[in-house]
Curated annotation (Swiss-Prot):
NCBIfam families: NuoD, PRK06075.1. This is NADH-quinone oxidoreductase subunit D. NDH-1 shuttles electrons from NADH, via FMN and iron-sulfur (Fe-S) centers, to quinones in the respiratory chain. The immediate electron acceptor for the enzyme in this species is believed to be ubiquinone. Couples the redox reaction to proton translocation (for every two electrons transferred, four hydrogen ions are translocated across the cytoplasmic membrane), and thus conserves the redox energy in a proton gradient. GO terms for cellular component: plasma membrane. NDH-1 is composed of 14 different subunits. Subunits NuoB, C, D, E, F, and G constitute the peripheral sector of the complex. It comes from the Bacteria. Its EC number is 7.1.1.-. GO terms for molecular function: NAD binding; NADH:ubiquinone reductase (non-electrogenic) activity; quinone binding. It is found in: Cell inner membrane. SUPFAM superfamilies: HydB/Nqo4-like. The keyword Translocase applies.
Length: 417
């Protein structure tokens, strides 16, 4: 009797569950995965090389386009690395704003993750609910930067502008009736901080709603429990960070272990898993959303009570006020030089990392004293996690490959860069 040989299957790069342009070459014995070989590079845009041809400030929009669902977290690592080289102090209010928006970005990322992960596995409803909440966070992005996604809001020395005193209002139009506009504007009568506070006060109930849909759902547990198990020792050997590492039971979070900005002033817990499977990683991320919401509430309370500057007073990095620039020749020259030639960063090298929604996102910069980086290296957490795809999926069924891709929370903007 002829022996059935293993066969090869191409998964992606156009597959809806591939989370971008992932090409996965699978070697299958029936429906059991024997080997999984990820092929990357289909979204390579030479970001690290392009960064060498742009000024330090011009590179900030490139950061938004790395992990394009965690925009401000990418910016944060980059501007902190520049601040290390410049030895610039950041005003306390700007630090609180950065932390608040980092945590809003974490919610933005995790909401997309739970929506798409649920959709991949077969849970449709949670996708719709998650995108409802994401809309409010996009409005918060738009309020400070004018852009719903690629904000370019952080700057070396602080943030681009202070939080606005008035949320933008919807107007009646062909696509929105008067009653719809009234409903949309109900919670937009106050400041941006009021809008964020109202969102945060109701968000925990929304997370409970997601958990009610999924946590004890029999089909959800069958698809996630004991799938993609990684032991604590192996997670460290593979270089896991973020929820992938904490899901294996290791309590490592840069916000606690290597505090930056004002995280050491804030109260929050680090959720960890027990079994290291996809279900534990799901539980970790769900609890992370609650902890992020708790941090956001603390930041809102502090920011309401403490007005102040949001940009460094060091004129080598901070532009003049717009009114001064338009009425004073010296300020006009200062503004012109700052945005044409750019800032000159002293010789040296610096590495800065943040607790990104996906793990440790790091930027390594080398400066030769010029107005452009000599070298920029990006440490993307998704790159490390995807490299474990073969090990995590071996011996599982073909349908489980989708679950493992979902639990890794992969975005190709940062992997291919």
């Amino acid at each position: 009797m002829a022996q059935i040989k293993n066969y090869t299957l191409n998964f992606g790069p156009q597959h809806p569950a591939a989370h971008g342009v992932l090409r996965l070459v699978l070697e299958l014995d029936g429906e059991v995965i024997q080997r999984a070989d990820p092929h990357i590079g289909l979204l390579h845009r030479a970001t690290e090389k392009l960064a060498k041809t742009r000024t330090w400030i011009q590179n900030i929009p490139y950061m938004d386009r790395l992990d394009y669902v965690s925009m401000m977290s990418n910016e944060h690592a980059y501007v902190m690395a520049i601040e290390k080289l410049l030895q610039v102090d950041v005003p306390l209010r700007a630090q609180y704003i950065r932390v608040m928006y980092d945590e809003l970005t974490r919610l933005l990322n995790h909401l997309l993750w739970i929506g798409c992960h649920g959709l991949d596995v077969g849970a449709m409803a949670v996708f719709l609910y998650a995108f409802r909440d994401r809309e409010d966070i996009f409005d918060m992005y738009e309020a400070v930067s004018g852009a719903r996604m690629h904000a370019a809001y952080y700057r070396p020395g602080g943030v681009y502008r202070d939080l606005p005193d008035q949320m933008a209002q919807y107007d009646k139009s062909k696509i929105r009736s008067a009653s719809a506009v009234k409903r949309l504007n109900e919670n937009r009568s106050g400041t941006l901080l009021d809008f964020i506070e109202q969102f945060a006060n109701g968000f925990d109930a929304n997370v409970d709603e997601y958990c009610n849909l999924l946590t004890d759902n029999r089909i959800w547990k069958q698809r996630l429990v004991n799938i993609g198990i990684v032991t604590p020792k192996r997670a460290l050997q593979l270089g896991f960070t973020g929820p992938m590492l904490r899901g294996s039971g290791i309590e490592w979070d840069l916000r606690k272990k290597q505090p930056y900005e004002v995280y050491d002033r804030l109260d929050f817990d680090i959720p960890v898993g027990v079994n290291g499977d996809s279900y534990d990683r799901y539980l970790v991320r769900m609890e992370e959303m609650r902890q992020s919401n708790h941090i956001i509430k603390q930041c809102v309370a502090w920011l309401k009570a403490n007005p102040g500057p949001v940009m460094s007073t060091n004129h080598k990095v901070s532009p003049p006020k717009r009114v001064d620039m338009k009425t004073n020749m010296e300020e006009l020259i200062h503004h012109f030089k700052l945005f044409t030639e750019g800032i000159h960063v002293p010789d040296g090298e610096a590495y800065s990392a943040v607790e990104h929604p996906k793990g440790e996102f790091g930027i390594y910069l080398i400066s030769d004293g010029a107005n452009k980086p000599y070298r920029m290296k990006i440490r993307a957490p998704g790159f490390v996690h995807l490299s474990s795809m073969d090990e995590m999926s071996r011996g599982h069924m073909l349908a489980d490959a989708v679950t493992i891709i979902g639990t890794q929370d992969i975005v190709f903007g940062e992997i291919d860069r």
